[in-house]
Amino acid sequence: MESVPGDYSKRVYQGVRVKHTVKDLLAEKRSGQTSNSRLNGSVSSSQSPFVQMPGSPVTSGYYGVRRSFLSDSDFHNSKQFSNDVYTSSVGKPFPCESSAGQSHAALLEPYFPQEPYGDYRPPALTPNAGSLFSASPLPPLLPPPFPGDPAHFLFRDSWEQTLPDGLSQPDPVSADALLTLPPSTSCLSQLESGSIAQHRGSSWGSSLAGAQSYSLHALEDLHHTPGYPTPPPYPFTPFMTVSNDLPPKVGPLSPDEEADTGSLHDPSPWVKEDGSIAWGSYECRRAY
């Protein structure tokens, strides 16, 4: 029983809405027909179907009411008038548009050359690009690819001047160690062990000095510094040979340090990737 009133109410609502609109349109159509017959008499009988014919009967009745006054009274006159307007306007706007286009083109030619931005923008940008992106100011900012160049040591000295004196002490030692690289190592191993580990060691030293992020390692290194050999007589090559003797000198190790020493025992990954991490940690400990 509940579904019947719902369907009934929906049907009644739709029916009322549709009938209302259709009734309004029919009433407007009838009123338009009666007004045409009253205003124009016999003329409305011949022209009212012409006005109300285009479109569907619903829309024709809706639009016929509003257009009936103008179309019935001025229909024949608007034909001749529209022809006069079109014929007179066909000859006029074309010369006006052409003259306007020529005048604008003549006025805007000195302001807009044929290639507006290609003539002067690139020469204005090329010296800026040359001054910003040329190779002359960048070498003091970026390290050279090979650590044997003297500019690399100058860059690292200028980088380490901001650190405390205790951290800037092993700079000449690392320079000597990099100068005494064996010729058997390839350029890739020189790059990885020299430049990357060097920057890691300096960044670790700065983080230890500033934020004390590795406080446990710092305390352990302070306790175990007498067990380490002195830095000056140890370049890069003796460190590879002494790496097997390193764990008994260190003493008790944390899990992180055991992972580092485990990478030290294997000589093959030392040349590849783990060597840079182990060398950076060793250099960071050597700062104390």
From Swiss-Prot:
Matches recorded under InterPro entries: OCA, POU2AF2
Domain of life: Eukaryota
Outcome when changing V22E: Abolishes interaction with POU2F3
Major subcellular location class: cytoplasm
Region (Disordered), start-end ranges: 24-52, 247-274
Keyword Nuclease in record: no
Record's subcellular location: Cytoplasm, Cytosol; Nucleus
Summary of subunit composition and partner proteins: Interacts with POU2F3 (via the POU domain) in a DNA-dependent manner; this interaction recruits POU2AF2 to chromatin and increases POU2F3 transactivation activity.
Family: Belongs to the POU2AF family.
Protein name: POU domain class 2-associating factor 2
Organism: Homo sapiens (Human)
